[in-house]
Regions:
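Acidic, surface-exposed loops and disordered segments
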Residues: 1-346
Length: 346
């Protein structure tokens, strides 16, 4: 698929004088630009008047790599954060109501699960204190970063990440109600890299994992052209790539000056959504600062290695939910395709 399959909205076209549903659908053009596991884009939205219902599309869950849906809900949380950042940019205040696990119906449209509701209101802003010009400037920078954000698979340079950026990420994570571990010590990063090697080797030793990964590669979801996607699909399915991937990815881990792990105190859907929101805000912040971000989920997809990571970080009762590299790198021009808003409305 080419860039034509990733339509990007024109901010100047925001329908300020239109009805609430039209404004909501415009904001969703930014929500769908969010990152997601394997570019699965597992979100659906229902719009009625000033209400946007957010659904997790479980038909797009990676049932082998992500059997408990952790990455599914983190991905939906990323889309939710984009929606809220866009609403703030256009002066559309909103409130978010998470649907608790106890109250959530078994299914929504097409077996999708209703996970949150966003209510739009011009009279109430997401960020109520807009007196600070710096705060307003940051919100604008985050919005601009939505279209610019890329997942960067390149090796990172060794130069450090500014302390001011790290402090901002920690503050944002706390505001989202989640934890953030920032691993800058080379020795601990080496230990995480060793876990990465083992995770890749274990996963690629599983034929069902290779088949699932091959399906997503083969349909072009990861941005490759048709021929490259088909070749990649066959390679993943039939070649033992675990050792090669483990070696490559462990080097990526050690190349990063920061390995970040977002954590939660419980294992609820709401916590996973909050982690997704925190990650996307971190990714937008990094983009606005000229930094690169690369999520790496393999360690967290292997239960005993996830437990080892938790012990390494001293998390106690908290759960590691999302891991990513942060640092400086040459730009990665890869642009993965996106489903248009029309395809994710229910």
């Amino acid at each position: 698929m080419d860039d034509a399959s990733r339509p990007e909205p024109d901010a100047a076209a925001f329908p300020a004088d239109a009805d609430a549903e039209t404004r909501a659908e415009f904001l969703l053009r930014y929500a769908v630009l969010a990152p997601s596991s394997h570019n699965s884009q597992p979100w659906l939205f229902g719009v009625e008047d000033d209400e946007i219902r957010v659904y997790a599309d479980e038909s797009r869950q990676l049932t082998v790599a992500d059997p408990d849906g952790r990455e599914l809900y983190v991905s939906v949380g990323c889309a939710l954060e984009n929606l809220l950042v866009a609403a703030e940019r256009f002066g559309v205040g909103c409130t978010v109501e998470y649907v608790s696990d106890d109250d959530r119906p078994e299914s929504g449209p097409d077996a999708a699960r209703h996970v949150a509701t966003v209510r739009l209101d011009r009279e109430s802003a997401v960020v109520t204190d807009r007196e600070s010009a710096a705060a307003t400037g940051r919100e604008s920078a985050l919005f601009d970063a939505i279209a610019d954000r890329r997942t960067n698979h390149r090796p990172f340079r060794s130069e450090s990440v500014p302390e001011s950026v790290l402090e901002r990420l920690e503050t944002d994570a706390a505001s989202a109600g989640v934890g953030l571990e920032l691993v800058t010590d080379p020795a601990r990063r080496e230990r995480i890299a060793a876990l990465q090697t083992r995770a890749d080797e274990r996963q690629f030793d599983d034929p069902s994992y290779r088949a699932e990964l091959g399906r997503w590669i083969g349909d072009g979801s990861l941005g490759a052209g048709w021929l490259a996607a088909r070749v990649g699909q066959l390679a993943v399915r039939y070649l033992d790539m675990g050792a090669r991937e483990g070696k490559k990815n462990s080097k990526l881990v050690t190349s990063a000056p920061v390995v970040a792990v977002l954590t939660a105190d419980d294992d609820t859907v709401e916590s996973r959504l909050r982690v997704g929101r925190a990650f996307e805000r971190a990714a937008l912040t990094a983009t606005s600062e000229g930094l690169a971000v690369h999520p790496m989920s393999q360690i967290l997809e292997v239960e005993d290695l996830r437990a080892e990571l938790s012990e390494l970080l001293g998390l106690g009762e908290s759960e590691p939910v999302h891991l990513f590299r942060l640092g400086h790198a040459d730009p990665d021009a890869t642009r993965t395709p996106r489903r248009p808003v029309e395809d994710v409305l229910v």
